Amino acid sequence: MSRVVVVGSGIAGLVTALLASRRHEVVLVTKGAIAESSTRWAQGGIAAVTSADDSVALHVEDTLTAGAGLCSRSAVEVLCSEGPAAVAALLAWGVGFDRDGGDLARGLEAAHSRSRILHAGGDATGSAIEEALVRAVRAAPVTVLERTAVVDLVRPGPAVVGVDVLRDGSVERIDADAVVLATGGAGRLFSHTTNPEVATGDGLAAALRAGAEAADLEFYQFHPTALALPGGFLVSEAVRGEGAVLRDAAGERFMTGVHPDAELAPRDVVARAIAERMLRQGGLPVHLDARHLDPAVLAKRFPSISAACRANGLSLAEDLVPVTPAAHYWMGGVATDLDGRTSLPGLFAVGEVACTGVHGANRLASNSLLEGVVFARRTAEALDVTAPTAAPAAAARPVTPLALDRSALQAAMWAGAGVSRDVSGLESARTVLRGDEAPLSLRTLEDANLVECGRALIEAALARSESRGAHHRTDHPLTEATAYRVAGRRKVAVPC
């Protein structure tokens, strides 16, 4: 039996820990409380083929289309073909998906050709999944270290052999035969985000400092509809799937003139259209209009969104709800194979922090929870396989804790590296990504990680002199005929 350290307690980390604990000693490290993760806030659901009128081939094609020519087909085929088994595993762990009679209830979301989105508690899918998996982990032979932040990966030679963590104000070392990063994204890079406070890119930053290869970092998905109110509460795609429409400040529906699928166009299209409309109307938000829909259906299907609206003096069923794009999901991350292996022996990555190429330039709605389960299952199996010899990596760098004005950093990233970008804005944002060396604390560690991630994102965005998917360059608005991926500063052709 070997020791495996899993970092992160969202869907990918919890599933990896559960399955790995059957054969290994597992230590689960999480920066906050175990239930505190982006998974908990996921509303729309999990996409998988579970009906006779759907097929894996259709799910594959929908995913490839959304990915704008940059998806790894092999990764997409794994995701979609293993999706039904992933759903079955969640059911076995006690996730209570909503039912329509005796059958699973299935919703429709943007860019899906079939109704295949499973949800739980209406719009509380992520919370239901997180609660079930936390219960299962608590009952499994897993050592859980809450409020414990990863400082650096330990790599004295070619391989990663442990983690240094910040716990109760002190740095401790945890030795490991394998480290699995499942730390999610870095939405806190931006002033508008749907991500929780813990999403500061800790795993990716540690991997970059350790010399791991990353890919697709220019592709950050901005969800089209977060409440344009304090807190940035996500308003799920599923509301538009039920028939809600978007209106500008003049009350005009505008998406019909943008894309044949109107409000159900791919996320990058809708987010960009909203951002452009907001610019035209002096920064005022656009509005989501669900007033023509059945109030009882809205209340049952979207209890969390309805409650968030009420908390702000609004009614989802009776009012125009102000919305804005917000940073939501990072398609890029630590480059891995289909079994979670990174370029460093002993280091694995899974979920949002990883990049298998499954999402390409733009993630299909509700594929992220599925990704977390499918690739966690594969990663847990791969822990038993001897890692192949890897090419020597650059020497690892220790973190330099930083004190900085986080709000200024977030505003600069939103303005220069947000929904739309150009070389001037990207270079301007880069000048803000600095801070003063400071004593190690959770805050200065997070700030250093945000700077590390922000610099990597900007370098990748500057390297891609085209517009594709979620990466929109106003100074390079066209999409090149040949698809390529940016890995570090290298451009790598995407096989057809």
Model-derived features: where do they sit?
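Conserved redox-cofactor binding core of oxidoreductases
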Residues: W93-V171, A182, H223-L227
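Short beta-strand to alpha-helix junction loop
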Residues: C71-P84, I117-R135, L145, T193-G201, ...
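Core beta-strand elements of the Rossmann-like FAD/NAD(P) dinucleotide-binding domain
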Residues: S2, G169-A178, S343-G346
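Glycine-/small-residue-rich beta->alpha transition segments that form the dinucleotide
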Residues: A176-A178, A182-G187, V353
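Conserved N-terminal glycine-rich FAD pyrophosphate-binding loop of Rossmann-like flavoproteins
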Residues: G32-L64, A68, P224, S236
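Glycine- and aromatic-enriched mobile tails/lids
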Residues: M1-R3, L19, E25, A33-I34, ...
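An anion/pyrophosphate-binding glycine-rich loop and adjacent beta-alpha core
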Residues: I34, A206, A212-V321, V373, ...
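N-terminal Rossmann-like FAD-binding beta1-loop-alpha1 element of flavoenzymes
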Residues: V4-L28
